[in-house]
Amino acid sequence: GAMTALVELREQGVVRAISVGLGRLEPLERFTAEAPLDVIMEAGRLTLLDRTAEERLLGLAAARGIGVIAAGVFNSGILADPDAAPYFEYRQADAALLERARRLQALCADRGVTLADAAVRFPLRRGADAVVVGARTPAEVDAFVAGLSAEIPEELWLALEVA
């Protein structure tokens, strides 16, 4: 099948890695458990608001030597700025989720950190090997790069864990 052909291409050096990227965890878990993958990309499940990939996927990937890329770290915008983009999973966020995101934002602001910077760094802290973000402008790219070196105190991470 297709996976056999991909493995052959990898062995021949035609491709360097075999990867699968999905937003739904169930099929991604199955691929991670059964397929000869090098890397997986999860979307929106290793975030400050949704940590299901941490619970269900990271250990399995590590045990099989599979790298993890986190995408969708803003959960459709709410973790970039809850008031400017109150969306979660491409829909209007409900009041409880919006309030939770605002609490996270306030915790960050109290310590001089943007919520977006914490959202981008969170998956790396939890075991992801890389993060994918989308930028619309060069200024957004610059902000993401600057955020990677922003000082985020350990005390903030601890507060975000329980928020």
Q: Language-model segments: which ranges?
A:
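Beta/alpha (TIM)-barrel catalytic core signal, keyed to glycine-rich beta->alpha loops juxtaposed to Asp/Glu
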Residues: 1-162
